[in-house]
Amino acid sequence: VKKKTIFIIEASSYQLEYSKIFRSKYGAILNISPDHIERHKTLNKYVKAKFKLLKNQFKDHLAFVKKDDLLISKELKLIKLSSKLIKVNTKGNNFIKKINNKYFLTETNKENLSFILEISKRLKIKRTSLVKIIQNFKGLQYRQQIIFKKKYLTIINDSKSTSFSSSIGVLKANRNINWLLGGIPKKGDQLNLPKKYFKNINAYIYGKSKKFFIKNLSGKIKYENFDNLKDAIKKIFTIIKKNKFTNQTILFSPSAASFDSFKNFEDRGSYFNKLIKRYLNEL
């Protein structure tokens, strides 16, 4: 660790809730959607916990927030920040349009990239260096990770997804989707996916919380339900074998916590990969 070393910390609302002294010179809230309500009890308390990241900042610090986020805008009207506020425009950035790395084509990752550009500008990072890194970035494991791709089939492992909002971007960015979802849903979570995407998706619900997911998908997206992930994957591969030359996407984006059957999302992602490897050998 050197004097100029920059630490990048992802602080959860769980950590921020009880934090009194943690502060960062560059604080960023990318977006806010209903999450962890089972922990914080109300959406308002969840928002307050997130905003502690910015409220603890000093006068010479910078607070980065998404420009058009309704919950962020609402909270900003209620509080006073000591730091300088920078509203990040996540739409219409010409630089982002030039990026051809497929990992950054989803709406969510375009938003992430908008924040990266704004913060790197303040850190005086050379644009040429940044472009090189972005173009060659392979993504993180179990976060919209393409684990298999051939002419007619793409398989994406997005085990990190623990809410509907975290699945929206990847659902919008792909076609002919076989969507695997299940686990422990977030209290009060709702699927806010525009209607035009419904016909593009067939859902395969697995696990004990089927009723919750069926309620959210019913009348919107075609679905089948299964007792476990293995049975759901088996059914998808049966369909793909019959339609081998039709482009298909298998998307594992559970939209729920993993603790019903797994130690964590990494354990869940690893298990998915093992099942996929087995069924690919049978194609």
Predicted regions and their residues:
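Flexible active-site lid/hinge loop adjacent to a nucleotide/diphosphate
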Residues: 1-104, 260-266
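Residue-level signal for inorganic ion chemistry
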Residues: 10, 30, 46, 64, ...
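Short glycine-rich anion-binding loops that position phosphate/pyrophosphate groups of nucleotides
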Residues: 13-15, 34-35, 68-70, 162, ...
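Short internal beta-strands
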Residues: 63-67, 180-182, 200-208
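Beta-strand->loop->alpha-helix junctions that form or flank phosphate-binding loops
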Residues: 79-95, 131-135, 145, 224-230
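Nucleotide phosphate-binding/pyrophosphate-handling subdomain across enzymes
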Residues: 102-200
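C-terminal helical cap/extension that packs against the catalytic core
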Residues: 190-248
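Glycine/aspartate-rich loop-and-adjacent alpha/beta segment that forms the canonical ThDP
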Residues: 255-282
